[in-house]
Amino acid sequence: MNSSSRIPAAGPLSYRQAGVDIEAADHFARSLRALAARTHGPDVVPTGDAYGALFRPPLAGLDSPLLAATCDGVGTKLLVARACGDYRGLGQDLVAMNVNDLLPRGARPLFFLDYIAVGRLADLEARDGRPGALSDVAQGMVAACAQVGCALIGGETAEMPDLYRPGDFDLAGFAVGLVDAARVPAGDVAAGDVVLGLAANGVHANGFSLIRRVLSDAGIEYGQPLPGMQSPIGAMLLQPTALYVAPVLALMSQVRVKAAAHATGGGILGRARGVVPDGLRVELDRSAFARP
């Protein structure tokens, strides 16, 4: 058998036959661009539909400007959202996990980009009068970016039915911020320094692999309330991650913050180890804050 006999005689294949709906992807991209335009100020340079967003950083008054960059996702909180059928908080989660990571450098968020990977876009479209999952995510991203003064300037939506199961999708985000070198916390922590903490409004978007395992082992469903609580555990877990940009930057403008940590993976103790020098320890007064 020669090689030519193995070539199929059928006509050319299309993207749609391969499981990728280019028209649906273009429609979603256009709708997201229209939403994202609400977050654009004069620093965003119009480029139409061209790839490669342009941004004019506000450098006035900065002696030694530095850019800070972060990349993060929302982890397996996606699985809780899917189980509960509630995706409304995930967009804010995605933005918050990134812009909050800029704060330990004292950086103000400038712009944000998203990456959305899906099995099939059709599985995530609006149904029965309810917005689709990705529409909820997009609305949340735009609202969160607007709240912190961060422009949503681009992103990517990839439809990969061979990689993701029907109804599955994943989220990642990228944020860039700006800070004057003189305002970056120097890390010169010393004995006697005061530790300040900002209260969380929930578990944010970390630790969900452990949380899901604990609930599964205990036989607790997401629709059940925990003892002494009225809200279902699912609703509590899906509380959107708090945006700390305004209070943290306001504090940093008034006092010199020596070090800061975003208490995500590893929690308070794990993150504190990264900013406290060897030979020192952090002492926390548990009576000073309410434990959940």
Per-segment meaning from a language model:
Residues 15-40, 44:
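Acidic/polar, glycine-rich intrinsically disordered N-terminal extensions of enzymes
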Residues 26-33, 51-55, 65, 96, ...:
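Predominant activation on well-ordered alpha-helical scaffold segments within soluble catalytic domains
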Residues 71, 183-233, 269:
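Short, acidic (Asp/Glu-rich) active-site segment that either coordinates a divalent metal cofactor
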Residues 106-108, 210, 256:
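Short loop/turn motifs at secondary-structure junctions
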Residues 160, 181-182, 204-205, 267-269, ...:
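Short gly/pro/ser/thr-enriched loop/turn and capping motifs at secondary-structure boundaries
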Residues 34-201:
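Glycine-rich phosphate/pyrophosphate-binding loop regions near the starts of catalytic domains
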Residues 20, 24, 90, 206, ...:
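A generic structural signal for residues located within well-ordered alpha-helices
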Residues 2-17, 34, 63, 123-151, ...:
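Glycine-/charge-enriched secondary-structure boundary and capping motifs
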